[in-house]
Amino acid sequence: MRRRPSGIETMTSQGTARGRFQRAIHRRHVQNAEVAAREMGGLSLADALLLCELLANADPARYERAALRWLQRFIDERLPPLTEVALAASALAELRHGKRSIGVEALKILLRR
């Protein structure tokens, strides 16, 4: 089996894996989003947040593990101060148990820092 060079994305008749991921998120198709994410070879924190948001709505049973993985990546990649870790954890809880729009907006702000 031939490996493709890193950073090169293959394209099918449905487009790139990234395009399929975005369409799956928009259409709220968890399985299609996960398949495309695997094909992409990993997600940015922003894309992983989109998948978490989808899971919070469509598959609550799997959301908590995904949210914990996202939080761990946020900590590992950004090395944020404790106050931002607490804010991120609270915002992730809002996605599932509170006002989703507030949680999403808070997390997007943290990602822009």
Regions found by a protein language model. Name each.
Residues M1-R113:
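Long, low-complexity, acidic Ser/Pro- and Gly-enriched intrinsically disordered regions
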